[in-house]
């Protein structure tokens, strides 16, 4: 049984590592895959697993951007350290809306929106949004091409967009990237800020899920720990590859292809839901 669950955890780790950073919804994909590849574990554990596995993914950002995000780096001068602290303060400002709403409505969202149909609809809705916005911005020069120019007001607006991602299928990265692009950020700035915003958000969400899992009287057996660690490690490795791919892809391309992917996948899934 452990072996069967391990290979399923590896598959989920691969999916998490790819979909966390591409604007196609990692949680949504994990919920969808769970319809077809079920781990032989409790529902409480799987709800927690689908969020906590993101810790592996977020560590990829920490490693890849360690120098840029580390305000204590001896290789930075005083001005560079100050800029790093300012960046972190903007990230924390952007976290506020989702932190407040998420804490208040987390259980409600889990009960009413963590399902196949919701994910399918959200994939289509935000896929269309990406297609329309990229078409609109095709010949429009971005106003903000450097993270230093990303204001606190802009950070708060992007944080408000992140609230939308509390509904599965939306995509945290997708919602925040869309929000940043709509207020004039370049695709690269929008993507990097979305990466950094994910660090406190995903750490917070993961620890909240672990706390609620334990508060229900659940415990971690050796099998659960092995599965959780395996999925997280796989997510970390795959995330490194996915992040590098996306940043390189955006040098010459936009997000339209991801919009079409979302629309097509969502339509297929709704068809499956209607006729299965």
From Swiss-Prot:
Catalytic activity: di-trans,octa-cis-undecaprenyl diphosphate + H2O = di-trans,octa-cis-undecaprenyl phosphate + phosphate + H(+)
Keywords: Antibiotic resistance, Cell membrane, Cell shape, Cell wall biogenesis/degradation, Hydrolase, Membrane, Peptidoglycan synthesis, Transmembrane, Transmembrane helix
Compartments, as annotated in UniProt: Cell membrane
Gene Ontology MF, one: undecaprenyl-diphosphatase activity
EC number(s) on file: 3.6.1.27
InterPro entries: UppP
Enzyme superclass (EC): hydrolase
GO BP of this protein: cell wall organization; peptidoglycan biosynthetic process; regulation of cell shape; response to antibiotic
Membrane topology, record value: Multi-pass membrane protein
Record carries keyword Membrane: yes
UniProt keyword Thylakoid, yes or no: no
GO CC, any one term: plasma membrane
Transmembrane segments: 45-65, 85-105, 113-133, 150-170, 188-208, 225-245, 255-275
HAMAP family on file: Undec_diphosphatase (MF_01006)
NCBIfam families: PRK00281.1-2, PRK00281.1-4, PRK00281.1-5, undec_PP_bacA
Function field: Catalyzes the dephosphorylation of undecaprenyl diphosphate (UPP). Confers resistance to bacitracin.
Note: Bacitracin is thought to be involved in the inhibition of peptidoglycan synthesis by sequestering undecaprenyl diphosphate, thereby reducing the pool of lipid carrier available.
Family membership: Belongs to the UppP family.
Descriptive protein name: Undecaprenyl-diphosphatase
Lineage: Bacteria, Bacillati, Bacillota, Bacilli, Lactobacillales
Gene label: uppP
């Amino acid at each position: 049984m452990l072996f069967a669950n391990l290979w399923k955890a590896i598959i989920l780790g691969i999916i998490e590592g790819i979909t966390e950073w591409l604007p196609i919804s990692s949680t949504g994909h994990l919920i969808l895959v769970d319809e077809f590849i079920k781990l032989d574990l409790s529902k409480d554990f799987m709800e927690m697993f689908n969020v906590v596995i993101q810790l592996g993914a977020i560590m990829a950002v920490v490693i890849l951007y360690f120098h840029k995000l580390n305000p204590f780096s001896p290789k930075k001068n005083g001005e560079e350290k100050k800029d790093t602290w300012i960046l972190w303060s903007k990230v924390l400002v952007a976290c506020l809306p989702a932190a407040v709403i998420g804490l208040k409505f987390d259980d409600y969202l889990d009960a009413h929106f963590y399902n196949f149909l919701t994910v399918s609809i959200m994939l289509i809705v935000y896929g269309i949004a990406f297609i329309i916005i990229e078409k609109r911005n095709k010949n429009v020069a971005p106003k903000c091409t450097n993270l230093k120019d990303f204001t606190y007001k802009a950070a708060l607006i992007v944080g408000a967009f992140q609230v939308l991602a509390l509904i599965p299928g939306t995509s945290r990265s997708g919602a925040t990237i869309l929000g940043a692009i709509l207020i004039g950020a370049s695709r690269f700035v929008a993507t990097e800020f979305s990466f950094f915003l994910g660090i406190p958000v995903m750490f917070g969400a993961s620890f909240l899920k672990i706390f609620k899992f334990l508060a229900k009287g659940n415990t971690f057996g050796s099998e659960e720990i092995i599965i959780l660690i395996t999925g997280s490690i796989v997510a970390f490795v795959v995330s490194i590859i996915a992040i590098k791919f996306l940043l390189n892809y955006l040098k010459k391309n936009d997000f339209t292809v991801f919009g079409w992917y979302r629309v097509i996948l969502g339509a297929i899934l709704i068809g499956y839901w209607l006729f299965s």
